[in-house]
Amino acid sequence: MTMFVDSHAHLDGKQYDSDREQVIARAREAGVQTMVAIGNGDGPPTLDAGIQLADKYPFMYATVGIHPHEARLAGEASYQTMEQLARHAKVIAWGEIGLDYHYDHSPRETQKQVFVRQMELAAAAKLPIVIHCRPSDGSHNAWDDCLGLIQNQWARNGLGGIMHCFTGNWAQANRALDMGFMISFAGNVTFPKAQPIRDAALQVPLDRMLIETDCPYLAPVPHRGKRNEPAFVKETARQLGELRSLSMNEIGERTSRNFYDFFKLAEIAESKVPAR
C-alpha cells in the first residue's frame, strides 16, 4: 500500500473526544503511516497534548510549542515546561509557533516576543520549528514580520523547519526555502479560491514538499465543511498530483520520503506498527 504522512494534526482536539480511536484507525486503513500530533493543546496548561498521543501510538510523533493565539499566556513557567518536554524522545519539532495577524488573539508585539523566545529555546534543543503565519486579510504583514524574524533569529543555525499549511505566494515560499524550510500544503490547496497557493505548489521543488491535514480544520474538497481527519490527507496529495502531473500515490510516496529524510527518521515498517 502507498504510504502517506500527515505532518500536522491536532488530534488532541475535543472534536475527536467521541471517536478518536476510530479516526486514527481510518487513517491507518487509508495508508497514513505516520502522523505528527501537534503539541499546542489549549495553551500553557496542556503543552504535553501531542506527547500523550505519541506515547500511546508508535506511529505518531509530537511537537511542543505555544501557538501565537495563546502568546499572551506565555510565561517563564511555560518556557521551563517546554524545555523539559522538548527532551522527550518522540518530540521532533518545536511548534507550531509564529504570528497570526488575522485573529489577533494576542497582541502582535507579544506574539513577536514569544516567537523569538521559542526560537531561542528550539535552537538550544536542536529542534526544527513548525511555523504558523497568517496575515491580515489582503495584506502580507505577518509574512513580512515572520520571515524577517526567522532570517534574523533562526536561519543561520541550519536547523530549518516547516512552513505549515502554506498560504503565501511563491516569493514567500522561495524565501523560506532559501532558509532551509520545507513547505507543507494542507486541504485548502483544494479550495476553488486557492489559486495563489496552487501557483506556489507548482514551483516548490518536489523534494521540499510535505502534506498535512491541520485537522480538525480545513477539510479538503470533497469533504469541505466537515470535520477534517488524517485519512483526508490523500485528497491534498491528489490535488498536488494533478498540479504536478503525478499520481496521488506518487505524491504520497515522495512527501513521505521527504518527511523521513528531513527529520532523519527511519521509515516505520508496517509490520512493526499494528493498526489501532
Where does each model-flagged region fall?
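Mid-domain alpha/beta scaffold segments of enzyme catalytic cores
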Residues: M1-R276
